[in-house]
Amino acid sequence: MEGSVTPQPAGGPFTIDITCFDGQGNWSSIQLQDILFGDVWLCSGQSNMAMAVSQALNGTAELAASVNYPNVRVLSVKAEVSYTPYYDLNSTASLYHPWAKPDPDSLGVNAVENYTYFSAVCWFYGRDLYDTYKVPMGMISTNWGSTPIQPWSSPDVFNSCVENATKADVTKSRCASETEKEFEYKPYFKNDTVLWNAMIHPFVNMTIKGAIWYQGESNTFLGTDTYSCFFQAMISDWRQKWYAGSSQQTNPLFPFGFVQISTSWVPQFGVINNYPVIRWHQTNDVGYVPNAGMPNVFMAVALDLSDPESPYGAIHPRYKQDVAARLVQAARVVAYQEKGVIYQGPFPTKFNVDSQEETIDVQYNNKGSGPIRLVGPLNNTFEVCCSNYTECQENDTWIDTTVTALTGLYSIRMNYTCEDLDAVAIRYLWSDYPCTFKNCPVYNQDGFLPAPPFWLPLDYSVSIGNSAVKFGGFKFLICFCHVFLFACFYFPLGRY
């Protein structure tokens, strides 16, 4: 059963009586109790999003405190695969827990396995949004560890990013029926599109405020080169599918937040070189969001939240509260249109090179970050490419530089030595584990937001503003009543 009601002010709880006529002279009714009107956010990704509240720092205390947020509601989805799209979750067996008020039970205190029940990042994000706006929040946690981006992408994404997209998995996802599947192999959780079908598609007819995403580690060794295309195309595709599936009630440019991946190693294990590459690809090879190719997208930089002592492995840092806080800071501008909020880490806008003195001045002046502050070690974090060419070549040498001074509110100076070569490019934090906990070199003035990594030519110049933050003017309430799902949330005018 599916229906909609007229817009209502955010709030609750309410009781809603629904009466239905089946067209054959039969009437039935259902009463929905304890209903809230507010914002729905979908949270997805791999194990760092799946990491449960109990696994986060101070998890036991966080679980106990969750009962203080009855106006945040949570839905926990089990891991499931399918070659064909689901239009609803198959049964209550598809859920760790149906829609519920947060408490230790609904957030997974009794979970037998880690990375199940409710996402820590999702919970802290929804909780902090509620603390900020006092608007009810509905949070959906649908994740699977060790997954690349491809299983979360529909066939249309592959059509955008894979030349002559005729992969067997994609063809099967698009064309095969469940009857045909009875005689074939069962889908594997890393097969193309199978998680889109089973764990995302069931929600596209539910109106949402936005989505947050924490994924990318698995693509450091699988499909690294195509990640930029896949991520951008997946965001666009999800937006199109939700806009159509919710009868044009969801913003066609709904806010999409992501976590730029953290670290994966401790020193004795070496470096996974593709971590900085994936971080770069997550921004569409621009370095910051929102940007022209990723409008209404925001991010939390996490490479300075390393946790080598994590009992879950260094690839799974426990500092999920910090991740969520940074996401919320960016969402305040991109999703909720606040003005005057510092929501981006410092990003270069221009480089001034003095080849005689061998100094480089890095200018930071992006409107979203404000003045800068130097915090951590000032050597071995900025590198310069020395070359005989005007562009850095694959075999050219990268040399470490040393930051020597903060030369103004928005600029720093560093020394370099290229001998008889020219300095043509510069990169920052271009390694798996570039700094210890909250101890990278450059932050915004209050030390809350780190500068993201970059790889840029030294003739780079850009003006960074909020031009890629786009807002809609929708005003609606949408209320879906499924056999196994219920969510009813209100989106007032201008909340995009």
Pin down the residues of each PLM region.
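Cysteine-centered motifs
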Residues: 479-481, 488
